[in-house]
From Swiss-Prot:
Ranges for region Disordered: 115-147
Record protein name field: Large ribosomal subunit protein bL21
Family classification: Belongs to the bacterial ribosomal protein bL21 family.
GO biological process: translation
InterPro entries the record matches: bL21-like, bL21-like_sf, Ribosomal_bL21, Ribosomal_bL21_CS
GO molecular function list: rRNA binding; structural constituent of ribosome
SUPFAM superfamilies the UniProt entry points to: L21p-like
Composition-biased stretches (Basic and acidic residues): 128-147
PANTHER family: 50S RIBOSOMAL PROTEIN L21, LARGE RIBOSOMAL SUBUNIT PROTEIN BL21M
Encoding gene (name): rplU
Keyword terms: Ribonucleoprotein, Ribosomal protein, RNA-binding, rRNA-binding
Keyword field contains Zinc-finger: no
Length: 147
């Protein structure tokens, strides 16, 4: 019994830093030093990629939810390889007709490894007031006067 409690505590420690980000129209839960298969990216192996669309970020102390994205948060990925997923068979048949069609599809994937999850410090807003610009009052142009 005590071992199971320790293992549950260890699993919580593994999730001290994670981020949920959007890439290729899908949302992924990213953790540092883990591999993920995402839709094919136009990048070569060993290239570095940065994701800016971070929806949620959790570190040791807090959870930050973006509106819609977390400001100044980035995830750095490294492309490990390009591969193809297993084949998915699609079978179409029209009843009472002699029409049958069997097709297959293999999704193109890119395997990436998360190198780091970074949160930039927000820039402090200056307390100086904006200078108000005063428009000069211009007289409306009158129509040509006839003499």
């Amino acid at each position: 019994m005590t071992n199971s409690k320790k293992s549950s505590n260890n699993s919580l420690k593994n999730h001290e830093l994670y981020a949920i980000a959007e890439t290729s129209g899908q949302q992924f839960w990213f953790e540092v030093n883990r591999y993920y298969d995402i839709d094919r990216l136009k990048a070569k192996e060993k290239d570095k990629i940065t994701l800016d669309k971070v929806l949620l970020l959790k570190d040791k102390d807090s959870i930050t939810v973006g509106k819609p994205y977390v400001k100044d948060a980035k995830i750095e990925l490294e492309v490990v390889s390009h591969k193809r997923d297993k084949k998915i068979l699609v079978y179409k048949m029209r009843p009472k007709k002699k029409t049958r069609r069997k097709m297959g599809h293999r999704q193109e994937l890119t395997r990436v490894m998360v190198k780091s999850i970074k949160v930039g410090k927000p820039t402090p807003k200056s307390s100086s007031k904006k200078e108000e610009t005063v428009k000069k009052e211009t007289k409306p142009k009158s129509e040509k006067s006839t003499n």
